[in-house]
Amino acid sequence: MDKSGSPNASRTSRRRRPRRGSRSASGADAGLRALTQQMLKLNKTLAIGRPTLNHPTFVGSESCKPGYTFTSITLKPPEIEKGSYFGRRLSLPDSVTDYDKKLVSRIQIRINPLPKFDSTVWVTVRKVPSSSDLSVAAISAMFGDGNSPVLVYQYAASGVQANNKLLYDLSEMRADIGDMRKYAVLVYSKDDNLEKDEIVLHVDVEHQRIPISRMLPT
């Protein structure tokens, strides 16, 4: 009796027939693992830029000090002629300055060049007398006295220079949030005119944590 026509034989034949365009399970698994690794890497990269109470990129990939957080403000220098200067006092939001006795540990400046940036700038942060009008002469003198660190930021073909952060440590000075109005960010355009849309300065002020309101605004 010919058993080739039996149902079992027919099912076996169908199971063994290769499907067109199919991939092996091991190949599909390897592709899925590679894609998963890429997604995890991308998510980790994106997470770096998300602000949190302990921002991972606050100071050279360090976290804020225990019990501290930070407030960021953004400065966009106007057009600065070659060899000239710009100064702007720090102005924190009212929601932060209401707690003016909270201590400030560090100030960090991060430079974000925009696509047309092709210049060299010097950037610093200084405690400035309230009587100072931040004139060109006054700012020039502060750059030259050596009393604060200066970040020299130059054009990089890649668009972002690796060294784009300046850290100013205030922990020994016992400075507080109320003192921040006495500090200013200063910029010197060394080699060329700096257009108003060439760089953005992100100023991070690390300070003791402040209470968070849990009431909705009226």
Swiss-Prot record:
Recorded GO terms, molecular function? RNA binding; structural molecule activity
Residues recorded as bearing N-acetylmethionine in the entry: M1
Alphabetic keyword roster: Acetylation, Capsid protein, Ribonucleoprotein, RNA-binding, T=3 icosahedral capsid protein, Viral nucleoprotein, Virion
Cellular localization per UniProt: Virion
Q: What is its main location?
A: virion
**InterPro entries named among the record's database cross-references:** Cucumovirus_coat, Cucumovirus_coat_Asu_sf
Highest taxon of source: Viruses
Name the SUPFAM superfamilies for this protein. Answer: Positive stranded ssRNA viruses
An example GO CC term for this entry is:
ribonucleoprotein complex
- Biased composition regions of type Basic residues, renumbered to the chain: 12-22
Query: Which residues lie within the region annotated Disordered?
Result: 1-30
The UniProt function text for this chain reads: Capsid protein. Probably binds RNA and plays a role in packaging.
Q: Domains: what does the record tell us?
A: The N-terminal arginine-rich stretch does not seem to be the major RNA-binding region that allows formation of an infectious ribonucleoprotein complex.
- Stated family: Belongs to the cucumovirus capsid protein family.
Q: What is this protein called?
A: Capsid protein
Report the source organism.
Cucumber mosaic virus (strain Kin) (CMV)
